[in-house]
Amino acid sequence: MTKRLKMIGRVKELEILSNACDKKTSQLIAVYGRRRIGKTYLINHMFSEHKKECSFFRFTGSYMLDSSTQKDNFIEAIHDWFKEEPTTSIENWMSAFNFLKRTIQKLQNQNQKIVIFLDEVPWIDKKNNGGFIGALGHFWNEFALNTNNIVLILCGSNSSWIKEKIFEDSSGPLYQRLDIKIHLKPFDLKETKEYLLKEKKFIIDDKTIAETYMIFGGVAKYLSLLDSSKTIAANIDELIFNSDGHLNKEYSEVLKSLFDTKASYYSSIIEILSSKQSGMTQTKIAEALGEKSGSKIKDAMEELSEAGFIVGLSKLHSKINTNYIICDPFVLFYNKWVRAFSKNELISLQKPYFSTIMGTQSYAIWSGFAFEILCLSNIDLYLQTRMTKGLAKNYGYWIFPGNENDSGAQIDFIVEYENSVYDIVECKFYNKEFIISKEYKENILHKIEMFKKYALKGKYDIKLIMLTTYGCEKNSHYNSLNIAQDIDLGSLL
């Protein structure tokens, strides 16, 4: 495909989908990722704007319905799209997919590509009590694979379900059958800027774009709700700090829809992590919950990671001590500033509320941490700016607790490259050029010395990187440090 498909972001994904439709064999595709990031929009856009010649069938699972009712809705969807009625009673999912097969066989143009888009697949038959997966597998293995014109797209927000039931179940009918996996992620900071300026028509600077990202992340649905006739702060008040705001109950609704009966337990884990900005190990989280570090907490951490809510950062040169932090900006913001309010308390809040907290010391401290999360979440943009993308081996954190000879040190963001090169990255969110003081300089030098002494053996080449809002003031302390690169937001964007 030579023509670029116009859409903010998603260029690679659109190319993949377009090429799949051009294949001379049937294709089985899985699209998964966090809720609200635009998975459904991506598929609909592809086949309404760029592959209109395909015959397109869509069915969406419903969160609250049982498998039998969903099966009835599936039959109704076939009728709506293809105008076909079953001639016999459809009692189970196997019969339902056989009806879909016969409907496809009746189509006049047998060479036309037929796209079957099953959205929110994890909701269709959550526990597989109705035999949905077996019937789907039979449909694919016995019918679709033997044609050359079917593109079957399985889509869902519950990434752990998709991986467990589709990717990793060696006894399942779709094991190793997938042709394409698309793990859709939120917009990065650059794509968020493009969306806000081009799609939403905001006229705002890079710092305001970063602040918007630090609250909403690159989640397309959240960004689409912003009104450019209002300030970002006014939008936040209306959407989040309003008891009837569109996003006021979003956090609990997302957890419930993804984790069902486990939502409360998972929320407790997130609440614990939100109180510890430096992060916690799985063992420490279990202790805070009053339980042992076993399979229950392990499974929970994996599911929260798959959902994109938390990330485990490895201590450099260590296979243990994975440190978990909240990496989803909206989840981080909600748990810090919104979760504690009851509905009545939200109603009685002084309005505008968000503007009143923006100037507080508490907000400044939180913003500094949220900016670190922004930087970690946009590691690819960082590496592009450093022109080192193909060389990076690993990134994470490093901590030295201290001993009788040396005081402790912690590096929150460090990138390891080939040939023993290391970026020590200092992330600072500031309202103007960041000023390096004597105390700050000495702290950085101590970190570097401890890293050299306790983390490195043999050759090394350490680069100190400043990543700040507006860059650093070039004072004597700045000049006395060997700063390899002074990166501001404009450089990332």
Predicted regions span which residues?
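Domain-level recognition of nuclease-like catalytic cores that cleave nucleotide substrates
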Residues: L456-L493
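Conserved catalytic cores of phosphodiester-cleaving nucleases, focusing on short active-site segments
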Residues: I379, I411-N431, I444, L464
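Hydrophobic positions on the alpha1 helix immediately C-terminal to the Walker A/P-loop
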Residues: L42, M46
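Accessory nucleic acid-recognition modules appended to NTPase machines
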Residues: K221-Y222, L226-Q410
